[in-house]
Amino acid sequence: MTLYNEKMIPILDDLENPEIELAGGSTVGMLLSVTNSLIKYICNKTLGKKKYENVQEEVLKIKEEANNLKKYALSIIDEDRVVLDEILKTYRLKKEEPKLYEEACKNGVDFCLEVTKKAVCTLKLVDRLEKVGNR
């Protein structure tokens, strides 16, 4: 039987490996996807329970939103690498092509802002679920 900690070791090794340039947003994507999975777990523990039948509709909405946020979070794990690569590539050319570098940096900031907004959405789901979810 494989334990979960054994499954995590390769991921953590990649994060520590200087040969693999994972950007910080990749880690944020991992954490957001785990957080949204935990939200879905609590929803699943709440749904179908007689004690919580008056909040089933709200819990279903929360679960659906958490699922969408989880999908987004998984996508940013790799997308963050693409954004960082573009910044690094244009950084080397910033004297010859300053506009390209500026655009890459702007895209990086826009990406970070979008990720931050999704993280806030996740926090809001936690707040909503805390009020109605399984205790």
Residue ranges of each PLM-predicted region?
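Conserved phosphate/anionic-ligand binding catalytic regions in large, soluble enzymes, centered on
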Residues: 17-40, 135
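Residue-level recognition of alpha-helical structural elements
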Residues: 23, 27, 55, 62, ...
